[in-house]
Every structure is written in structure tokens, then in C-alpha cells.
Amino acid sequence: MCNTYYKRVKFNLFLYTNSIEMELLAVASIIGYGLFSSQQGRETRPDRNRYAEALGSGQGLDEDYDVKPTDMVRKYRKKAEKRWKKAQVPKESGIITPNMRPSEVMPYFTSGKSMNTNTDYKQRKMELFTGGVLDGHSVSGTYKHKVEAANMFGMTPQGRVTSDGTVGNAPGDTELLKARSVNSHQYNNVLPTEQLRVGPGLGVGPEVAATGGFHQFYRQLPLNINEYKLTQLPGRLVPGGTTTGGKGEIQQIASVNHNPDALVLNYDDRPPEATPNGAILASTQYGKQPRGYAGLRPYEKNYEGIAEADVSALQARYLDQTRGRPRTGDGDTEPIINPNGERDGTGSYVTENMCSMTLESQRGLVNRYITPPGVTGVVQQGGEMRPEFVPETTIREQYEDIYYTGPAGTTVTPTEPMNVVELQPESRHAKRAGQDRAYTPGAGRVNNFAPAAQGAYGLKDHPTYNALQHVVSEPIEQTFLPAAQGDDDRFGTKSNVNNPWGNPASLQIANNQLAANKFNRDVTNTVNLDYDAGQPMKQQNFQPKAWIPNNTDDMKMLPLWKRKQLQAQKNKQQRK
């Protein structure tokens, strides 16, 4: 009984353990089959160690491992590799390649691959448009030079038609015919239309004299530009050139803003000693550049900005037109001209025939002094007749030679011309030598002290200093002096031309010329003369007025809503 029970329990345990083993075996077989089947038909995982070797080579691993790419991927990689190598020769394939080497199955252009980025294509395109590479040096090998089209027919041989037919070339005439023929597509010195040079620009009529091409900068323009043009032209003396009184130590005013230690005195408080002062020309106005009214007002009576600013200039000196070269001779090589500052002083000099443009007048011994020596005997006795060598003048200096104005001591004309400040840069050190004297200029370079016959034409509205009474006259109304006239081609034209803007009538001409220009209509308004560049303090008080339509043409310029608004206002005023 016991044995039977024991055997039965043992058999049950055997069945139980055997079933567990069978279950474990079944689970293991299922897992193994899953692992086996999972390896079929797919590539290996990216994190396997040897995957990098298989990637890019196009070849799978050893036959022991079933992890090589499918046929589709392998064929694509071979095709892409071949296509990439072929793309390196653009003149054979013409393929525009992306900027990355194709390796995996992916869209041709992605965020990492953009179009037209092949360097060979860029080089080929640059050569095509620039033509900057020779045939033998072309990087892409595709550049071809641009060639001008040849003539369709050759030159007709010389001959004559007779009753017997056409006779050939006469002996000896072939070379002459070739020399007279220009086998070209272009004509020399032939323009399609005739050039007509008019005016300085828009809004100015053709009756205004113009020289030197279109929009050239060395011509006189109307006052409606601003009075700066009047005071910057060649042929003007520096205002204040004959002002006397005061000592050098006291007159160093310059500008209170930029030189706070300067002693500033009114004209009435300056000592009465007369200081030698010659004719100060525009070409010598260098040194301290005048600064306009900026900030604090200097403590000087009637100060109006740059009009009273002091600028360092030469003392009793006048440098000649030899482009900064000193004159030859013993002792002081810079002759003192008109040392006492008298209006009719002696000792000035002229240049012979400076208005001529011939080489004879540009070179050689042309300078000489004139008139007897002055009272002080500074100039040599018996007048100065020593010739001087004048270097060849530049084109710009020749342009200035057509103006005839002279310093206060000039007794004959023409005198040596002055320079335009813009054409004489500060780097000319000889022009800046000996600038140890301060003087008080006016608003610009209009000479208020020399008579009009010596070139002082234009506006004269600055106070002058009376050296005898030691007083400053009060400013008067603006006075137009007569325009300088003469038979010379003063402004470079072929006819007698007065100063275009030297009188009110000429200014009215400019006003009429600009009348049809609706944008420049208010430019020539005479009220603007009260706020010109010579009176910067008045410019501070200038109140611009709004443009008001006062005729039908002006109304047409306005939009429809503005016209209705103005009409409503007009009707409202009429009802009142």
C-alpha cells in the first residue's frame, strides 16, 4: 500500500517536473525562433560596432552574418558613387550636384542639401559672365572668349567703270586707299547728336551762360542758392583787410568758445595805434578756420556769428602766384607789399599777360614789380624790375587767371589773380607761413574797402571801421553795386557777360526762370535775403511759413479732399 502510494507520488512529481521542462523548452524554442526570424531581411542595428565599416563601402559583412544591405540599397550606393565621381567633371556631365556626398536613401534635396552650391558650377558661371580667365587657365575648361563680329564684306577694290568694263586697281593707289579707310564699326569723334550745353541744371533757362560742362561747380549761381556763392568766388578781397588799430596781444580774439583765455575788447576800447596791414587776399585766408555761432555768444558788440569771427592771416604780406615758391633775392624772400595799409599805397606788382593760355605766358620771366618805391623804402629803389621765373601754371590756376581784381594798393590792371580757397588746399605750407596777425572779416570775401573798380562788387551790408574816428558805422540797407563789365571773357563765354547776379534785375531774371518750377518757387523769394549765410544769428530767428495756394495752378497741386476743405473754409468766411 505504501509502496504503491510512494510510486504514484514519484510518478506525479516526474510528470510535474517533466511538464515544467517542456514548458521551459517550448518558451526557449519560441524565443529562439523569434530571434532567428527577426534577423531575416533587415539590416543590422546602427549601434553595432562593425556597422560603420559596412556603411559607405557598398559591401556587406562576411557571409557568416546575414546583416548586409538589401540589393536595392547596394545598387543605389553603387549608382550614387558612380554618379558622384562623374559629377566632378562638369564639362562632361553638366550635373549640378548637392553639397553633400550621397550615401543613404534620402530625398535629393533636404535641409542639409541645397541647390546650385557646386563650386565647379559657380566657377563656370563666373567665367561666363566676367571673362576674366584665359582659355588655357580656365578652371572649368568651358570658358570661351567673346569675339566681336567680323565685317560681312571686305573693302571694295579701287577701280573705275569704262566702256570696256571695270578696270582694276591703278598702280600706287592701293596703299593710299587703305590709309584713308578705317575698317571699323565706329566713327571717330562723331556723336549721335549735337551737344547743347545749357544752364546749371533743372529750372534754369538756356539763356543763362554756362561753361565747363553740365553741373560744373566753378560758375556763379544766383543768390537764391545762398550768399555763400557770392562770398566764395575768385576775384574777391578779404573784408577787413585794411582795418587798423589794436596791438597783436590784444587782438587775438579768434573765438571765445574755443579760446576762452582770449582777451576780448570792443572796437572803441582798442588802443589807437595803427598796425601795418597789407591787402589780405582770399588765397591767404588759412590758419584757424572760423567757426560759426555755436552755443555761447562771445562778449563783443554787434556779434553775429562768423561775420565777426577773427581768423589768423598774414601781416603786411602778399604771397605771389608761384604755387608757394618764395621769390628769389637777398634777405627776406617775401616782399612786403603796401606796408602801411593805405588805399593808394605803392609797391604792388602785376603779372604780364596772365590771361593768356599760351605756353609763352605760362613759363619764363613774366613777373615784375611796378610803380615807384613806397615811403618806407621797403621795395628796391627805382621800382622793382627784377624778372622772376614763374613755373608752369596748372589747369585750375589757368581757370582763375581770367578774373581781374587786385589788392588795395593796385594802381594798374590786370593784377595777379587770386585763388579760390577750395582750389588751394591747406597742405600748401608756404601759404600758411607767417600768419601771426588777426583781423576781422565780414560775412565772406566781398571787399568792403576797395572801390568797385577793383572788384568789390556784390552785396555791401557789413559795418566798416573808421580808423580815424575809431568808430564802427551802423549797418545800412543792402546796396547792390554795379556789375563788373568789360570786353574780356570774364566768365569764360564768347560774349560780353555781366555779373549774372550783381543787381536786382538779374535776380529777377532768375526768379522768372524758376517761376514755372512749383518746387523752387519760394527759393527766389526776396525775403530769403534777410536770412542769408552772412547773418547766422538772424537764421536762428527765421520762421518758415507754410505754403499757401493762391491761384488755380496751386490748387491743382492739391488732392481733392484738400481742395474741398479749402473751399469749405472759403465759403464759411464769405457767409460771415
Curated annotation (Swiss-Prot):
Regulation: induction: Expressed in the early-late phase of the viral replicative cycle.
Keywords linked to the UniProt accession: Capsid protein, Late protein, Virion
Superkingdom as given in the UniProt entry: Viruses
Any matching Pfam family: DUF5899
Keyword Transport included in the entry's annotation: no
Single GO cellular component term: viral capsid
Signal peptide as annotated in the record: none
Subcellular localization, as worded in the UniProt entry: Virion
Hydrophobic: region residues: 13-35
Record InterPro entries: P2_DUF5899 (IPR045418)
Principal place of residence: virion
Disordered, as annotated region: 322-348
Function: One of the minor capsid proteins that constitute a network internal to the major capsid proteins and outside the lipid membrane. The minor capsid proteins glue and stabilize the capsomers. Also acts as a molecular tape measure protein that determines the size of the viral capsid.
Free-text comment on this protein's domains from its UniProt entry: The hydrophobic region might anchor the protein in the underlying inner membrane.
Quaternary structure annotation from Swiss-Prot or TrEMBL: Interacts with the major capsid protein.
Name of the protein this chain belongs to: Minor capsid protein P2
Origin species: Paramecium bursaria Chlorella virus 1
